[in-house]
Amino acid sequence: MLQERIEARWIDCFAETFALCGVTAGDTAAILSETQSRPVNVHLAELALARLGARVFHLVLQSPRLTAPVPVRSTGASDAIGQLAPVVQALAGSTFVADLTVEGLLHAAELPDILKGGARVLMVSNEHPEILERCMPDVALEPRVKAGIKRLRSAKTMHVSSPAGTDLAISLVGAQAGGGWGYTARPGTISHWPGGLCLAFPAEGSVNGTLAIPS
């Protein structure tokens, strides 16, 4: 098992990723974490932002009681903020937010208000930094992901098949489509690291067919 300690190369990884998000000297950067966040990633974020010359501050929340019967992390549905207005205001007033919460803010109820302030938010998945190092953002992914999102948004149906017998017809009419390439430099937006995916959320009842799972 790899140790969770500060490594120079991991500071480099965080700094390079934050630089892709447009973080420069003098920017106000908030590090949002909670009591069950991975400490090494919180420290790496702080050191990387300091290296870039950002003005860094921490917001540390108490991890809420579990509401799911299974381990949950990096879902994007964090409820750690708990509608605390001072926290939302502090994040919305920042230039950049490094999201180190356990689940991430991607689908959090407070995200729209945070983005309205113009903050750029990067959700750092709750993984060992060695995994983040192996999944560094690649600028070549951005145009490919954007092209994939465009195809999803223009498509009416998706067909999924496999040699095992899967044969699914999925209606994409009205589906929400999106994606991420591992960084964001546009104010009022969020992305997540690792990135490099396109996805759609079909409406209820829009999937028909057979899903075969090999034994």
Spans of features found by a protein language model:
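Active-site bordering "gate/hinge" segments
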Residues: 1-215
